[in-house]
Amino acid sequence: MGYDVHTEKGFVNRGNLHRMKKLMRLARQGDRMTLAFLGGSITQGSVSSQYTNCYAYLVYDWFVRRFPKTAFTYVNAGVGGTTSQFGVSRVEEDVLAFKPDFVIIEFSVNDDNTDFYQETYEGLVRKVYGNQFAPAVLLVHNIFYDSGVSAEEKHREIGAHYQLPSVSMKPTVYAQV
């Protein structure tokens, strides 16, 4: 059984791609780079059959295969059942201490679609995006596949405000499930 996933539909905000372009230039140069992933159980890979099947590792593996001259460090700071409120309290130690060049943030399933979680998510995004090492940031919006519920609406507003690239599983993968 094959899936017909239209990846273009997943781009909900292209944002300012300056840092992404810089990331790709650095990756082509063959230096050392750190890729970090911050989120809940989806990022952690808790339901993956093996850790190499979780999205975070697959993204890391794509970079390794695409840029073989570059030595990549993989930082998976996914902790199941946690929200952006907990994420903002641990981001410095679990992510920023590694001086990441690229950070994916994913809390759309565990956060509620409320103003409170929009504030905690914004605090997290500001901490990462405003870091002195200026990492490229990608916001990933997942969804409860059984109900279609997520905090994507509130999180997308933050991504648009800071002009950050954002992708959504709702119009792509969720549409196929």
Go through the PLM ranges and name each one.
Residues M1-F37, T43-Q50, V64-T70, V177:
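N-terminal secretory targeting modules
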Residues L38-G39, M169:
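A secondary-structure boundary/capping signal
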Residues S41-Q44, V109-D111:
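A short, flexible beta-alpha/helix-coil linker loop
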